[in-house]
A protein has these predicted regions:
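Small/aliphatic-rich secondary-structure junction motif
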Residues: 2-57, 73, 77-79, 159, ...
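A short acidic, glycine-rich active-site loop
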Residues: 56-65
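Charged helix-capping and loop-helix junction motifs
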Residues: 21-23, 98-99, 123-128
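Short, flexible loop segments at boundaries between secondary-structure elements
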Residues: 134-150
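Structural beta-alpha unit
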Residues: 1, 75-109, 149-151, 155-164
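Short secondary-structure boundary segments
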Residues: 9, 42, 108, 112-114, ...
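Glycine-rich, Arg-bearing micro-motifs that act as flexible, cationic patches
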Residues: 15, 108-130, 148-152
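General small-molecule cofactor/ligand-binding pocket signal
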Residues: 39-41, 82-86, 140
Length: 164
């Protein structure tokens, strides 16, 4: 069995910390329980248009900064961790995350949900929703750290081959 946890993080300008912090804490706790290595992954989206390549997600190294901070915090907590940055075309973030999970033979993919709404699809967000439906390995979706107490448990999880 794999000894890796893939922690997928974003750096969305709207509020990059609450859901990322909650997911990182969950990955830290899982790693402490299992001794697994944590791979912190950020995927940049880009589009190619008439005038060349255009970055569509956060710029100015925000993604790299978030990854570096989380890796540093995990290591300070005694967890083995490394960071990775990948790029993909717009709309293919879930596929890129699953590709990295496959490459690293991750035991589980962990990510946070950034939405505040109660509508299930919007609650999870499009990337989280796609991961849950496409994954052939366990996926754990963690609510925002400021979510109501009723949502203190993971929002959704799969076991294997997309089972919930």
């Amino acid at each position: 069995m794999s000894k890796n946890i893939l922690l997928a993080v974003d750096a969305a300008p709207r509020d990059p910390t609450r859901h990322v912090v909650a997911a990182a804490a969950m990955a830290r706790d899982l790693s402490r329980d299992t001794g697994d290595h944590v791979i912190v992954l950020h995927v940049h989206e880009f589009a190619v248009g008439r005038f060349g390549r255009l970055q569509v997600d956060c710029g100015d190294g925000e993604g790299e900064g978030v990854v570096e901070t989380i890796v540093s915090d995990l290591r300070a907590a005694g967890v083995s961790a490394e960071g990775e940055i990948r790029e993909t075309h717009v709309g293919h973030v879930a596929t890129a995350i699953l590709s990295e999970a496959e490459e690293h033979d991750a035991r589980i993919v962990v990510l946070g949900s950034s939405s505040r709404t109660d509508l299930p699809r919007l609650l999870l967000g499009s990337v989280a929703s796609r991961l849950l439906h496409m994954a052939a390995r366990p996926v754990l979706i963690v609510p925002r750290s400021d979510a109501p107490a009723r949502a203190a448990q993971p929002l959704a999880a799969t076991t294997a081959a997309g089972e919930r």
